[in-house]
Amino acid sequence: ASVSAQNLTLEKGDNIAFVGSGFADRQQHHGHFETLIHQAFPEHQLVVRNLGFSGDEVGVKPHRSDEVAGVDYFLNMKPGALTTTVGKTEVTYHAGAHFHANVIFAYWGFNESFAGAAGLDTFKANLDGWLKKTLATDNGKGKVRVVLFSPIAHEDLKSPDFDAKLAADNNKNLALYTA
């Protein structure tokens, strides 16, 4: 999929989902960004769900366990019970409300960067496939809009255990995986 920088316009009633690894996950615990979104658009009645998990990678079935459904289920939920077999386990999910993500904030690349230059082609192919599939999706609120967030750099937080060489190596890999 071709990617170009554009301005994101949020519309009244948009359902926003955060997906990806640790950067998205941490925003469940530190909701500053979500708060700013609601503050900037108080009349929009936005619904935000954070589906990020530190172990997730693009192209790898998110949710690190065979006993948990993939993120696609959570992006397009309908009220009621869904019983499905995931891996070797029968699981019943109970959704209390509709949620049809039409804006997705995607935080991919950090976990994948640990594969270094050798993993870059796989990451690009997985991201391209995910984008094509996601951008072609209509969860009942029109075509999905995606915002890609680049992984953040390894910073010196002034810890006595800080390893400058490790940080420099990590940042070289992160730069490869950053748009």
Where do the PLM segments sit?
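Alpha-helical cap/lid subdomain in secreted, periplasmic
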Residues: 10, 31-49, 56-179
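Mature N-terminal, pre-catalytic/accessory segment of carbohydrate-active enzymes
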Residues: 8-16
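Catalytic nucleophile-elbow at a beta strand-turn-alpha helix junction centered on a G-D-S/GDSL motif
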Residues: 15-29, 54-58
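Boundary at the C-terminal end of the N-terminal hydrophobic targeting segment
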Residues: 3-5
